[in-house]
Amino acid sequence: MSTDRACMLCGLVQSTAEFNRNGCPNCQSIFEEAGVSAVECTSPSFEGLVGMCKPSRSWVARWMSIDSYIPGMYAVKIDGRLPIEVTELLPHYKPRDGSQVD
């Protein structure tokens, strides 16, 4: 059984231990402002992985809206919903669960 989880905001995939220890390197400041833990904003249920070495130069990263994030592995689709405390801070938030079509 995998212990990997995906951040429901940016899609970064890390182990549960990494999220517990360091939070999400892309989104931690938002989670802290909302008063929630990084693990509350992650999901063990996700589909597809994309490896990003240079997100700022990748068309796939632009398409996934992750071109300003750190290099790493990102989930394409993530099951779950962010806590309302987080979504209220983000007026342009688009869920990564496939429920919103562009």
Swiss-Prot record:
An example Pfam family from this entry, by short name, is Spt4
A single GO molecular-function term is:
RNA polymerase II complex binding
What biological function has been recorded for the protein in this entry?
A: The SPT4-SPT5 complex mediates both activation and inhibition of transcription elongation, and plays a role in pre-mRNA processing. This complex seems to be important for the stability of the RNA polymerase II elongation machinery on the chromatin template but not for the inherent ability of this machinery to translocate down the gene.
Q: Give the organism, scientific name.
A: Kluyveromyces lactis (strain ATCC 8585 / CBS 2359 / DSM 70799 / NBRC 1267 / NRRL Y-1140 / WM37) (Yeast)
Q: Which UniProt keywords apply?
A: Centromere, Chromosome, Metal-binding, mRNA processing, Nucleus, Transcription, Zinc, Zinc-finger
Q: Which PANTHER family match?
A: SUPPRESSOR OF TY 4 (PTHR12882), TRANSCRIPTION ELONGATION FACTOR SPT4 (PTHR12882:SF1)
Asked if the keyword Glycoprotein belongs to this entry, the reply reads: no
Task: Provide the leader sequence positions.
Answer: none
Q: Say where the protein is mainly found.
A: nucleus
- Which family does the similarity line name? Belongs to the SPT4 family.
GO biological process per UniProt? mRNA processing; regulation of DNA-templated transcription; transcription elongation-coupled chromatin remodeling
Q: What is this protein called?
A: Transcription elongation factor SPT4
Compartments (UniProt record): Nucleus; Chromosome, Centromere
InterPro entries from the entry?
RPABC4/Spt4, Spt4, Spt4/RpoE2_Znf, Spt4_sf
Q: Which SUPFAM superfamilies match?
A: RNA polymerase subunits
Q: Where are the zinc fingers (C4-type)?
A: 7-27
Query: GO terms for CC?
Result: chromosome, centromeric region; DSIF complex
Subunit structure, as described in the record: Component of the SPT4-SPT5 complex. Interacts with RNA polymerase II.
